[in-house]
A protein has these predicted regions:
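Ligand-binding pocket segment of bilobal, Venus flytrap-like solute-binding proteins
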Residues: 71-75, 145-212
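Pocket-flanking alpha-helical
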Residues: 38, 57-93, 177, 197-203
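A conserved helix-loop-strand patch within extracytoplasmic ligand-binding domains
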Residues: 93-146
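Ligand-binding cleft/hinge of the Venus flytrap
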Residues: 41-48, 130-164, 274
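C-terminal functional modules
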Residues: 245-307
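Short helix-initiation/N-cap motifs at beta->coil->alpha
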Residues: 31-32, 50-65, 165-177
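Short, well-ordered beta-strand elements
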Residues: 18-33, 50-55, 134-138, 241
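A bilobed periplasmic-binding-protein/Venus flytrap-type ligand-binding module shared by bacterial periplasmic
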Residues: 106-117, 220-233, 257
Length: 307
């Protein structure tokens, strides 16, 4: 886990952020987990007197916008899969990792359980199933970090995959394809991750053998990253961002409401915050409203019915 970075210290009233910090700009890349956690952060910032904005941006454009100081923070830097897109921005100092907000996640290739039972259990098995798979691996939107790893495998003929092609689509498009394929009991290989409701919706298995591509056992962490200078410019806002933490069950609950129940992410965030005060009370240590007042009463009032 990333260590919390040092922040300027001061008394509660002196902790107020300047007016220029009021518009907290949080990139939302459109993944369901990103929509959920971004909505939680935005709800808290609104309760604290900020004016959060959540522009929808592609992953690579998120980091460009942070470099150009048009976005302040991003709560969905998946690692190790996301190490390549963010690398040049970390190298030039325009973006910095602030904290890990989720541990114990997974991100790698998966198959339906019946395909796993039939013998496709490891990355080394994919090539032998080529004709049955139509030489296709299903991924996410163009520019996605997981897509890039799959494309690198294909180009390098890693695991003898040079005949395969990656089918790029939105998250919902890919999952619709997975659903149709499972309904017809055909084989499919696709990008999968946890937390996500797909783990409840489908009987799926994560493939082994991809440690050098997606990390050991497909394990992942998710980080909060901020633009250069944000801790100094807006220390109170950055302090809250540094303390936000989620668990896999937390995110599964919120994502299920978004996907299955079609609830808007801001509504999901409010419901989750109201139902899980013990989760976020600790995030407020040293955090005030934007004008320096105590944070907990402000958030309680905001979340109260009619607030």
């Amino acid at each position: 886990m990333l260590a919390l970075l040092a922040f300027p210290t001061a008394g509660s009233r002196a902790a107020a952020d300047p007016a220029a910090c009021a518009p907290v700009r949080l990139s939302n890349v459109g993944w369901t987990d990103a929509e959920a956690v971004t909505a939680v952060a935005a709800t808290l910032f609104e309760a604290l007197g900020y004016a959060p904005r959540t522009p929808m941006l592609a992953l690579t454009m998120t980091y460009v916008a942070m470099r150009d100081r048009r976005v302040d923070a991003f709560l969905s830097n998946w690692e190790p899969s996301g190490s390549t897109p963010i690398a040049p921005f970390l190298a030039d100092g325009s973006v910095e990792r602030l904290a890990t907000n989720l541990s114990g996640a997974h991100y790698t290739l998966a198959v339906p359980d019946y395909v796993w039972q039939a013998g496709l259990r490891d990355y080394r098995d994919i090539a032998a199933w080529g004709s049955r798979l139509g030489y296709m691996i299903f991924g996410l939107e163009a520019g996605n970090d997981g897509n890039a790893l799959v494309l690198d495998m294909i180009r390098a003929n890693q695991f003898q995959l040079q005949r395969f092609r990656l089918v790029e689509s939105s998250e919902q498009g890919m999952l619709s394809q997975v659903d149709r394929t499972i309904q017809s009991h055909r084989p499919i290989v696709f990008l999968a991750w946890e937390p996500h409701p797909m783990n409840l919706r489908f009987a799926l298995r994560y493939l082994t053998g991809g440690d050098k591509v997606f990390g050991p056992d497909g394990g992942a962490t998710v980080n909060t990253v901020i633009r250069r200078g944000y801790r100094t410019d807006c220390p109170n806002a950055a302090r809250l961002l540094a303390r936000i933490r989620f668990t896999i069950p937390d995110e599964n609950i919120m994502m299920l409401a978004i996907q299955r129940d079609h609830m808007p992410p801001p509504q999901v965030a409010r419901r989750w915050l109201r139902g899980h005060p013990d989760a976020w009370h600790a995030w407020l240590d040293g955090v005030t409203t934007r004008d320096g007042a105590p944070s907990l009463p402000a958030i309680r009032a905001f979340l109260a019915p009619g607030g």
